[in-house]
Amino acid sequence: MSSNNPTPNLEQLMLEARQLMKDLGLPDKMQGDTPIFVLLVMLDMKPAKSWSEANNQKWGITPLMNKMRELGFKNLAPNTRENIRDDCVGQLVDAELATENPDKPRPKNSPKYCYQINQEVLYLVKKIGSADYPIALNNFLSNYQTIKHKYQAKRQSQRLNVKIAHNFSVSIAPGGQGVLIKSVLQDFCKYFNIDKVLYIDNTVDTARGYSPFIDENLINYLGIDIDKFKNSYDKPDIVLYKSDNKYLIIIEAVKTGGAINVERRDRLLSLFENVDVKLSFVNAFESFKELKRLTKEITRETHAWIMEFPDHMIHFNGDQYLFH
């Protein structure tokens, strides 16, 4: 790959970026126009800019899409956001060419969730079009497995591992609700003698991917409509089952908002229609300060649990107490 033009036009940039994708062994689907535009934006490249001027600033998906339009790629409807995230940026992360949230862990729904091209890739990119590129490419490919291991180890170290059954653990995604969810699974379950975990929203089961934990056998045993549950956008953060008195405990891990109000409670109830067990709704908070701030959102016939005081429960439904 070489170029005598230090300030390439857009067509030339795309051609050279596509060649980079090929050189790095990325699949054909990552060599189309959309992934190429994603890569150019993440490298802060545009016409009349030399590859040596590339950088690897952090990008959120929405700002990235806005920049793509500005660069000239107009065919981006708002509903393509997930495709950009999963099929383009996500593929770069899977290949260890980019990193999610390099500065600190964040929950998936954080508006500050971001991605960054890895430093080793940036070093290679800066050599595109120069006589040093073949050597830089060879060095990168020779060290690729070491590079992959480094970033995989970093992600693994950030995960929050918690045992939810005998000899069975799950990894909770770091950041945001992660610490609170881990505390619910460890402390709440301990103090209130909860013996089964039916569902956890924020778990990790691949090198990168976020995939909910779900006990399908328990769902079927309780008579929950599994297809309706899986396909619903209204699933809670955690669902527990207390088998000694047949209580299904639906928990929201509340950070900046999202406490169970009247509307939210009704939507959650619809997921468990015709289930022959008692239901209990719990808002989980990290601190009493957070509970106080959001108290007005919380509807009756729910409860509040605070991570700071794990053996206590606050009831928002008069004389009806949890699990009795």
Curated annotation (Swiss-Prot):
Q: What is its EC number?
A: 3.1.21.4
Q: How is its activity regulated?
A: Activated by K(+) and Na(+) ions, whereas NH(4)(+) ions appear to inhibit endonuclease activity.
Q: Which cofactor does it need?
A: Mg(2+)
Instruction: State one Pfam family annotation.
Output: BsuBI_PstI_RE_N
What's an example GO BP annotation here? DNA restriction-modification system
Recorded catalytic activity of this chain's protein: Endonucleolytic cleavage of DNA to give specific double-stranded fragments with terminal 5'-phosphates
Q: Which UniProt keywords apply?
A: DNA-binding, Endonuclease, Hydrolase, Magnesium, Nuclease, Restriction system
Q: Give the first-level EC class, as a single word.
A: hydrolase
Q: Coiled coil as a keyword?
A: no
The record's annotation in InterPro entries points to: BsuBI/PstI_C_sf, BsuBI/PstI_N, BsuBI/PstI_N_sf, Restrct_endonuc_II_BsuBI_C
pH influence on activity: Optimum pH is about 9.5.
* Keyword Lipoprotein set for record: no
Gene Ontology terms for molecular function: DNA binding; magnesium ion binding; type II site-specific deoxyribonuclease activity
Q: Which family does it belong to?
A: Belongs to the BsuBI/PstI type II restriction endonuclease family.
Q: What is this protein called?
A: Type II restriction enzyme AplI
Q: What is the lineage of its organism?
A: Bacteria, Bacillati, Cyanobacteriota, Cyanophyceae, Oscillatoriophycideae
